Curated annotation (Swiss-Prot):
Protein name: Sperm protamine P1
Chief location: nucleus
Tissues expressing this chain: Testis.
Family: Belongs to the protamine P1 family.
Keywords tagged on the record: Chromosome, Developmental protein, Differentiation, DNA condensation, DNA-binding, Nucleosome core, Nucleus, Spermatogenesis
Cellular compartment(s): Nucleus; Chromosome
Encoding gene, per UniProt annotation: PRM1
Stretches the record annotates as Disordered: 1-64
Any Gene Ontology CC annotation: nucleus
Function description: Protamines substitute for histones in the chromatin of sperm during the haploid phase of spermatogenesis. They compact sperm DNA into a highly condensed, stable and inactive complex.
Domain of life assignment: Eukaryota
UniProt GO BP: chromosome condensation; sperm DNA condensation
Molecular-function GO term, any one: DNA binding
Organism: Dromiciops gliroides
């Protein structure tokens, strides 16, 4: 019984990780980028920066 329990547990964990990995990665990337941008561009307004990035991303996705 111990063996079976271990196996089922690892299986469920791997499934959960696969689903959640992409989201976590994206969040980490965004957080890091935004932090760096803040440090570098203290003068530039945050709104304009985010808007520009969002538009460029949308265009790229639609065209390609």
């Amino acid at each position: 019984m111990v063996r079976y329990r271990r196996h089922s547990r690892s299986r469920s964990r791997s499934r959960y990780r696969r689903r959640r990995r992409r989201r976590l990665r994206n969040r980490r990337r965004r957080y890091r980028r935004s932090r760096r941008g803040r440090r570098r561009r203290r003068r530039g307004s945050r709104r304009g920066y985010s808007r520009r990035r969002y538009q460029s991303r949308r265009r790229r996705r639609r065209r390609y």
